[in-house]
Amino acid sequence: MTEARRSVYFISDRTGITAEALGHSLLTQFSIDFEQRTIPFVDTEEKAAQVVEQLNVASQRSGLRPIVFSTVVDAEVRRVLQTTDAVLFDFFDTFIAPLEQELRMPSSHVIGRSHGVVDNNMYDVRIDAMNYALNHDDGAVTHHYSRADVILTAVSRSGKTPTCIYLALQYGIYAANYPLTQDDLNRGKLPRKLVEHKRKLYGLTINVDRLQTIRSGRLPNSDYASLRQCSYEVARAEALFRSEGIPYVNTTTMSIEEIATKIIHEAKLERRLY
């Protein structure tokens, strides 16, 4: 008989992004395969009652109490959720109340402050940074590099594009990326377009076997994906980084979030979004 998986619910009065982020940061500490579900826009007592019923049914069917992470703000809605048989982790109760006491002032209790368009200026920064990342992807446009906060450079399929997009969306950082081509690697020198922006460069590298796996998924049985080619490109790229004094990080075992955080810290970048 198959053992039931523990159910986890992320409940929010908005998108559920914050509940997911906070919950995942805790769940990753346990080597368990959770069955996860997000229930957004629980912003009325009626909706909360429906959620409670759903949680209680899930508990009865599996014999295991669901684990619930909630970022619901409204006090009445939260009171309804607290009647569930599930294990409820209410981030509002856990963090806001102690903060109110320490700061000696009540919180705003405004729904959606962390992800809603509360500050139009911050929204514009995020969109502008995102557009910059997309327009300056893979060396497509280089004449606006003077505006970049950072320029990621690496061989193909090392994680440049997703890292730039994450830096833009999460931190409002203007991130461009430039691919190191076969000619660049053969010369062993920085491409001319990057020389004047050397102080903004940050390199990415990757383990050869991982790079081969990624490239084989895209172009199987090609020279581009061969072990020989991948080994050559990685070795030459790392040698170039060292000779030019360009900081770099191996992305093989790192998440996009970890890569971005390391770049911000080591390159001393100033984030525009919090």
From Swiss-Prot:
Reaction equation(s) it catalyzes: [pyruvate, water dikinase] + ADP = [pyruvate, water dikinase]-phosphate + AMP + H(+); [pyruvate, water dikinase]-phosphate + phosphate + H(+) = [pyruvate, water dikinase] + diphosphate
Positions bound to ADP: A154, V155, S156, R157, S158, G159, K160, T161
Disulfide topology: none
InterPro entries: Kinase-pyrophosphorylase, PSRP
Domain of life: Bacteria
A Pfam family reported for this protein in Swiss-Prot or TrEMBL: Kinase-PPPase
Gene Ontology molecular function terms on file: ADP binding; ATP binding; phosphotransferase activity, phosphate group as acceptor; protein serine/threonine kinase activity
Keyword Transferase carried by entry: yes
Sorted UniProt keywords: Kinase, Nucleotide-binding, Serine/threonine-protein kinase, Transferase
EC number: 2.7.11.33, 2.7.4.28
UniProt key word NADP: no
NCBIfam families (alphabetical): PRK05339.1
HAMAP family per record: PSRP
Free-text function comment from the UniProt entry: Bifunctional serine/threonine kinase and phosphorylase involved in the regulation of the phosphoenolpyruvate synthase (PEPS) by catalyzing its phosphorylation/dephosphorylation.
Similarity section: Belongs to the pyruvate, phosphate/water dikinase regulatory protein family. PSRP subfamily.
Protein's name according to its UniProt entry: Putative phosphoenolpyruvate synthase regulatory protein
Species: Alkalilimnicola ehrlichii (strain ATCC BAA-1101 / DSM 17681 / MLHE-1)
